[in-house]
Amino acid sequence: MALYWCTDDIMETYNDEPYATEIPPADKKYLPMASGHSITTALGFLEVADVIVGHNIIGFDIPIIKKFYPWFTPSGLVVDTLLLSRLYHPNLLDIDKKHGLNHMPLQLYGRHSLESYGYRLGEYKGNFAKTTDWKKWSQEMQDYCVQDVVVTNKLCQHFHPYLNGSR
C-alpha cells in the first residue's frame, strides 16, 4: 500500500505497488491542515502499510513520530532513501562533478540530502524550511511538505532498479 494523499480526513491509497511510479492525479487534494484525528488515522494506515518510504525516515521521522505517538510501530518494510543513497552512491561528489549540475548550488554537491536530490531530479524543494519556525500551519508549509513527498517518490523511483536487481 502506498499512501499519497488524503481527502475528507480519510487516507486513500493511490497504488498498491510498493514502488509506485505515478504521481497522484491533479484532482486529488491534500488536506489543508491536519487535525489530531487525521494524524492518528494516517499513522494507523502507516502501521499496517506493506512498505513505508522516506528520506532519513529511520533516523528522524519514525523517532519523532514515536516521541509524540509512542504506540506507533510500523509492521511493514521501512525503506530509507538516505541509507540507499549512501549505499549505492558513496562517491556522490564525483558523480555531481561529472554531471556538472550548473543549477545546483556548489554547497550541495556531494550531499545526500533531499534538497540536493531535488536539484538532481529536477524537483526543487523550495526555501520554506529555511525561513520558518514551523509553529503555525500555512499554505506555504503545506506546499513544501507536498513537494517533499514528490521528491521522495522520485528518489524512490531512482533507486527501484537497484532494489529489484535490474541495475
Stretch-by-stretch model annotation:
Residues M1-W5:
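Short beta-strand scaffold segments in enzyme catalytic cores
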Residues T7-I39, V51-G165:
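Active-site-proximal helix-loop-helix substrate-binding element of RNase H-like nuclease domains
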Residues L46-E47:
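A short, aliphatic-rich alpha-helical micro-motif
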